[in-house]
Regions:
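A short, conserved, highly charged catalytic patch centered on acidic carboxylates
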Residues: 1-92, 100-148
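Conserved S-adenosyl-L-methionine
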Residues: 64, 304-430, 438, 483-484, ...
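Sequence-specific dsDNA recognition surfaces
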Residues: 73, 636-653, 668-710
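A conserved structural/catalytic subdomain of Rossmann-like adenosyl-cofactor enzymes
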Residues: 121-135, 422-636, 783-784
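Long recognition/docking surfaces used for binding and targeting
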Residues: 193, 200-293
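A short glycine-rich beta-alpha junction/loop motif
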Residues: 528, 734-742, 774-802
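Non-catalytic DNA-recognition/assembly elements of restriction-modification systems
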Residues: 578-661, 796-837
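A short beta-sheet element
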Residues: 710, 714-761
Length: 837
């Protein structure tokens, strides 16, 4: 097969999956870009696809036009001119724009009617020789029977953005016509399920539907007969419920009332071939619809990108499930927060695919194969979700993927009554999941539910992690997505010790910031890969290496668009073979990843048992160790007051400068990224009476939390975009710091305040801040205790105050030069308007 390299490449790639389903071998049956010497054009022509079946004489050709271009008689005539050329001589042609398919007789230019109807079909490979034989005998024939072919006509697959738009359109259809969207997700899911069943019926020989209705036929119904579509859909559901083993997923009645709603949704769904959409696109679009219609953000639901699912599968081992199945081992794979079933569908399909390969390689008898298929579909995969509609969708997904819905349950996984896992009877061999982030599940749990958990908490993730550990068999594995805060906050220390006590931590994988951004979720997260211990290690005496890995790209940007030339196969192969390969050295890196090892005895000595990648980074630790050896002081040693943050005044107490007495220094607006104190007419002030209250409180408690003096160093200590900003308060006016600012007061004879401020905002102090801060996206902070840990570089000549001042002056001089150049460049850009006059 020659390569495809034309302006119509995208169109050709859209129809190739359809041709493959029709039985054609893309490599052996097609020639691409075949030159044609006899043509109506003045220049040489090329046939986009010539169907030869590997023979000397071609059978028909396919002419592809640009996506979005309406097909015209001119397009038909061009294809037929190729068909009539001396090199080609085929009896019929196909013209397509990636959306429509039209077949024409090469002799009379008439549209060919297959089985008495004009449809977007191409004869299958098993039918084509008979079709060509008919046309050779009757060159002008246009009414051709292809054995009552009941296959679906061609429809295009859609990329993610267009699928999102299609699903959003469906949601709008329900909202506008029904005037009620409470059941939009459940109802749309049922119609989508019917369409997916229709495609499954088209693809699989051993799967049949108990009715003859088809979406593409119903879509042709005129609006005044829309009630026929409504009746057809209800009849389809009724027959599935009554006559199939999977009918329970459709038992909940449809709430849609208006026939026009049914017709509109059927038209939209009939326009797409979902089996030709990428798995990523289908899953992402479905999850997009979940969020848009369920208001399910309370449950922390969001889509786990396929690339991340693949990374997690590579970590635990791609062949683990199939090997267990073939060997006859007992295996239970659970996702306790399964959503619409993304993990389970992927794992089941991959396992079935690997089993098929083993059969083709003659490693299994047909009987072995059949037994394994049955086991994979019925005994291995379990899933739970707290939302009834989402759990039903997971069942639907599993049915479409291969009828593995038996153990998908609508339940609260954290309840003691959950059926898919029990703390008192651990039976999970592998848990792969992405549990809800940011939920406070503990508040909704009954007293007996809480008794399951040894580490008391209300955080949903913490509860999920504990129950995962407690419900996994010894030697079983857990691979879960987690909020970064689980790895580093002081509140999570008890949980991390519980993990270290009960599990061997195989890997902690730091994920790129854009991991969940395609679905409008901005969460910094990691993957935690654990193995359940046979016996708890209460004293944390077991010393082994934990792999810490950072991935810088999963192959797509924040919008979801794929990165050109990103080689996912190379990336996944290295994740599988190299990331946890300690033999490659304690520090190792590869294609879009970097990893290092840390011994657990070091982590056990850490006050908070931190497990975040940035905290243990070897480069950071090496420089920190150097400063400690040089006997450099910490902030705790330098600060003449207790390092602390106060409480912000109520915004009701803020006044303008004219009415105020003391400035309120805010981390976001009063401290610049270049180390300057910023006071504007919009700055907030408080009256003297309130300032005196703060002053009195400091004197009574014998500690200063937010009263600022001239020369104090002010460190912004919370929030994305503000944390780490630092300045020196250089005004002789009363001021207090808000609750997001840490005050550091030093002896100017020991260290220069400006040097320290610059060290914290752009020197190695900034690196320490990045390593020490805790929390996750949107909720990060540097606690006073973490500020105290920062070591200040006074090594060598930096101990000299004059040297410190000179370093700071040079830094600020360079920054002012930079800002001046930026301002100058902006003025140059503004002059563009003057060019227009």
């Amino acid at each position: 097969m020659s390569s495809i390299n034309t302006e119509t490449e995208t169109v050709i790639k859209k129809i190739l999956p359809y041709m493959k389903r029709r039985g054609y071998d893309i490599e052996k049956d097609f020639d691409f870009e075949t030159a044609v010497s006899t043509t109506d054009r003045y220049t040489k022509g090329y046939v986009d696809i010539l169907v030869t079946l590997g023979k000397t004489h071609p059978l028909f050709l396919i002419e592809a036009k640009r996506i979005g271009k309406n097909l015209t008689n001119k397009d038909r005539d061009q294809a037929i001119s190729y068909a009539r050329s001396k090199e080609i001589k085929v009896p019929f042609v196909v013209v397509t724009n990636g959306k429509d398919i039209q077949c024409f007789n090469s002799k009379n230019k008439q549209r060919i009617i297959w089985d008495g109807r004009r449809s977007d079909k191409i004869p299958s490979r098993s039918q084509i020789e008979r079709v060509v034989k008919i046309l050779r005998a009757k060159p002008e024939e246009i009414m051709i029977s292809i054995s009552n072919d009941e296959s679906l006509p061609f429809r295009q697959g859609l990329p993610l953005r267009q699928l999102n738009a299609l699903f959003a359109k469906g949601h709008n259809t329900i909202r506008k016509i029904e005037k009620d969207e409470d059941f939009a997700f459940a109802d749309f899911s049922k119609l989508l399920f019917l369409k997916l069943l229709e495609e499954k019926n088209d693809l699989e020989e051993n799967f049949t539907l108990p009715y003859s209705y088809r979406f593409y036929e119903l879509a042709e119904t005129p609006v005044h007969n829309a009630d026929q579509v409504k009746n057809a859909i209800k009849s389809m559901i009724e027959q599935i419920v009554q006559n199939t083993s999977y009918g329970d997923v459709l038992r909940e009645p449809l709430r849609l009332e208006n026939p026009r709603t049914y017709l509109g949704l059927v038209k939209d769904l009939a326009s797409v071939s979902f089996c030709d959409c990428s798995v990523d696109s289908k899953g992402a679009a479905f999850e997009y619809y979940v969020r848009a219609t369920l208001k399910g953000k309370k449950l922390g639901q969001y889509f786990t990108p396929r690339e991340l699912v693949q990374v997690m599968t590579c970590l635990v081992g791609e062949d683990k499930i199939i090997n267990s199945v073939v060997m006859g081992s007992t295996l239970k794979v659970l996702d306790p927060a399964c959503g619409t079933g993304g993990f389970l569908v992927y794992l089941m399909q991959e396992t079935l695919s690997k089993l098929e390969i083993k059969k083709k390689n003659r490693e299994l008898t047909q009987e072995n194969y059949d037994q394994c298929v049955k086991k994979i579909k019925e005994e291995i995969f379990y899933g739970s979700d707290a939302n009834k509609g989402v759990a039903a969708s997971a069942k639907m997904n599993m049915i479409i993927a291969g009828d593995g819905h038996t153990h998908i349950v609508h339940e609260d996984s954290l309840s003691i009554n959950a059926v898919n896992w029990k703390v008192e009877n651990p039976d999970c061999n592998l848990i792969m999941t992405n549990p809800p982030f940011g939920t406070a599940e503990g508040d909704s749990l009954a007293k007996n539910d809480k008794e399951q958990f040894q580490v008391s908490t209300t955080k949903g993730q913490y509860l999920f992690l504990q129950k995962m550990i407690d419900c996994t068999v010894a030697g079983g594995e857990i691979c879960t997505v987690i909020d970064e805060g689980v790895l580093n906050t002081s509140k999570g220390a008890s949980l991390r010790k519980y993990i270290l006590t009960n599990c061997i931590i195989r890997a902690v994988v730091n994920l790129p910031a854009e991991t969940f951004k395609p679905n409008k979720i901005n969460v910094k997260s990691s993957v935690l890969y654990l193995e359940k211990r046979k016996e708890p290690d209460f004293d944390l005496e077991d010393n082994y290496r934990i792999t810490f890995c950072a991935i810088d790209s999963l192959g797509y940007i924040g919008s979801g668009d794929k990165i050109r030339d990103y080689d996912k196969s190379v990336f996944l192969e290295e994740i599988k073979k190299n990331v946890m390969n300690h033999g490659l050295g304690e520090e190792r890196k590869g294609y879009h990843w970097r990893a290092y090892d840390v011994w657990t005895n070091v982590i056990a000595e850490d006050l908070y048992f931190r497990l975040d990648y940035k905290y243990w980074d070897p480069k950071f630790k090496k420089e920190l160790s150097r400063l400690v050896k040089e006997d450099c002081p910490s902030i705790k040693q330098l600060n003449m007051i207790v390092t602390a943050r106060g409480i912000s005044p109520s915004s009701d107490c803020y006044v303008d400068e004219n009415d105020g007495y003391a400035l309120v220094v805010k981390a976001g607006s009063n401290i610049s990224r270049f180390g300057e104190l910023v006071i504007t007419q919009d700055s907030d002030w408080i009256e003297k009476s309130l300032y005196d209250e703060y002053l009195q409180r400091c004197e009574e408690n014998n500690e200063n939390r937010n009263i600022i003096r001239k020369g104090d160093i002010l460190l912004a200590s919370t929030g994305d975009g503000t944390l780490g900003k630092c300045c020196v308060f250089d005004k002789s006016i009363p001021a207090i710091a808000d609750g997001h600012v840490t005050i550091i007061r030093v002896d100017k004879n020991v260290i220069d305040p400006y040097y320290l401020a610059d060290y914290l905002r752009c020197g190695f102090g900034s690196t320490q801040i990045s390593a020490y801060y805790s929390g996750s996206t949107g909720l990060i902070e540097l606690t006073p205790e973490q500020v105290d840990m920062i070591i200040v570089d006074t090594s060598g000549n930096k101990a000299d105050i004059d040297i410190q001042k000179n370093i700071s002056k040079n830094i600020r001089r360079t920054e002012k030069k930079y800002t001046a150049q930026i301002e100058k460049a902006e003025k140059v850009l503004e002059s563009v308007e003057e060019i227009w006059g």
